[in-house]
Amino acid sequence: MSNATNNTLGSLLPQLEAAANSNSLYGGMVPNLRFNITMIVIWGILLTIHVVQLLMRQYWFSIAFICTGILEVLGFIGRTWSHSNVADMDAFLLNMICLTIAPVFTMGGIYYQLAKLIEVYGHRFSLLPSPMAYSFIFICSDIVSLVVQAVGGGLCGVAVTDGTSTTTGNHVFIAGLAIQVASMAIFLMLWFHFLFRIYISVRWEHINSRPISLSLLKISQTEVDYLYREKFHFLRLEPKRWVFHYFNLAITVAVLTIFTRCCYRLAELVVGWDGYLITHEWYFIILDALMMAIATVTLTIFHPGFAFKGRSTSIPITPGHVDPETLPHTDDVEDILDTSDSKQFDIEKEEFQASMKYPISTFKQFMSKIANLFSSKKKAKL
């Protein structure tokens, strides 16, 4: 087995010990065959749709959603496999690893959409100085979360080898999930702050008053659009563009459902591997499988490629602290924000690579150090 598999196996040892009497890795519960096959079909359809959307719209960050689809399909294949043999370690690990990691990719895509929306509405609505900072900070946070979970798994593995308690490793593993939940909670606050600024604050600015009243709803988006960034008014005002008009609501639904799922996973581990949550599949069906399905179906209907007009419109994320609205020369702005159709895919690809370069290199360094640490301990024992 690889180091990653060994680490993950180590983190699951408390469950193995608790379920030893029933010879089941699911605490005595047997995954429902019909449900898990149904989920394989549903996720297979969603995965196919996102691949087609990527090819049609050339929207580079669709790859994040495709990765989620692949992991979900593999995860439910693992659960289907486990139905016939609940003691099969390979099937159990395929399920646990894939379904645990899958939401990270969806959230990575969502972080990037906030940066795009800040460019569409204007930098003044952003709490952070740079739109790309949202992607950078929260993608790094998710990677740190995965690293901490790997460390927890490694500690459990070493503890079992030494014949000591796995409690510390299990606590570290739970801490990794807690970091993910805390990171998403912070992102939710920043997201709702952004929504407050573009929907409430602009109306206060428009009427030069700050009433807290339903009368604000009578002010249409068209009336306040002059307070947004002029360059992308065509995205916001075109009457037939219902996908963009409801895009912010779609992102909100997706984030809240994924956040619910992550809270469930954290509670599941806190209660224990042999606890009530993990041994009753209905909790998994409603709070994990259904939540992820709702999030992905929502992002499939309100796909960013449709919301931002795919390759026909370029919305590059402004680097650093530069606000294009404050640049003195229009020509300079156009040079920085080149909207030629032929460059859209390359721009998206470069931004994706730029946002992931440092987080991935940091993740590799962490994992290398962890592998060396546990490898040296094993050699010392020999």
From Swiss-Prot:
Cytoplasmic-facing ranges: 56-57, 112-135, 193-241, 303-382
Bilayer topology term: Multi-pass membrane protein
Annotated GO biological process: phospholipid translocation; sphingoid long-chain base transport
Superkingdom field: Eukaryota
Extracellular side: 1-34, 79-90, 157-171, 263-281
Glycosylation sites: N3, N6
InterPro entries registered for this protein in UniProt: RTA1
Keyword Glycoprotein: yes
Any GO CC annotation of this UniProt entry: membrane
Induction: In response to loss of mitochondrial DNA in a transcription factor PDR3-dependent manner. Induced in response to altered glycerophospholipid asymmetry of the plasma membrane in a transcription factor PDR1-dependent manner.
Pfam families for this protein: RTA1
Impact upon substituting N3Q: Increases sensitivity towards LCBs
Family: Belongs to the lipid-translocating exporter (LTE) (TC 9.A.26.1) family.
Name of the protein described by the UniProt record: Sphingoid long-chain base transporter RSB1
Organism: Saccharomyces cerevisiae (strain ATCC 204508 / S288c) (Baker's yeast)
Gene assigned in the entry: RSB1
